[in-house]
Amino acid sequence: MNLAHMNLAMFFEGTGQGVAGKITNVTRLKDLCVEDERQRVHLEPGPGTHFGAYFFGKVCGADCRVILRSARRWFQQNYRTLPSTDVYLFGFSRGALLARRFAEWLEKINVSVQYLGIWDTVDSALKIDVSEACPKSVRYARHAVARDERRRYFKLLPLRLSAPRAGEERVFPGVHSDIGGLYEDNHDIADATLTWIAESAVERGLRLKPDATLPRRLDLSKLPTHDSFRLLSNLWGLLGSSRRTFTSCRLSGASSSALHPIEPRKTGTAGNVKTMG
């Protein structure tokens, strides 16, 4: 087959996710993507899912370097300069940190990123240093961040954009796993962030399946959120609390205490994406 253009879409799951049915918005978006010769798709399970690192991978991201090596191998096996190739990177939590680190590596080898879509980057991985600055080789980026996360160990790593046209960092109501789609009892906020990131990726060439359907946009100010700090099943709260500040985030014209809601939209299409009305 003589291809004039190809997409490479790479997905980095969050800590402990991507195996045994444990998924977030990262895998949900990956599963909506077309996979063929014109678009190759790759998923990296999150830290704490690799043999020998089940505990320390979850605690401190000990297997992050293993994940990056695996991602580089896949990229080197699949990237082509002819035909032209667009690269799309996605990640949640530490997976977002890895997606950003991978984008920095691509910049060093003179490969641009067509789109970077990430959910609530947390800066809590050993020996993985990532800059707040978005690599200039990233053509467009979107970063969905959690307004209400209070756990100290889930320190946000903002995405500093070189110019407004380079992307958007938006604060959503909810805690870390509300944003990334980890809670099973309520997906409303996660659905909103999934649609926000996916639609922008499609506008920039990501191909979704013909029957792919994204959730409609909602007024998030009326939706319930979780309290990750008080959940008994979560021991991270024992490490202390710290309220996030958003001085470097663009808040869509609103303060952090009065988030601009995503407006509802009618059923329609975005590229080849349907939204549920």
PLM ranges: what are they?
Residues 1-277:
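Active-site- or binding-pocket-proximal scaffold segments within functional domains
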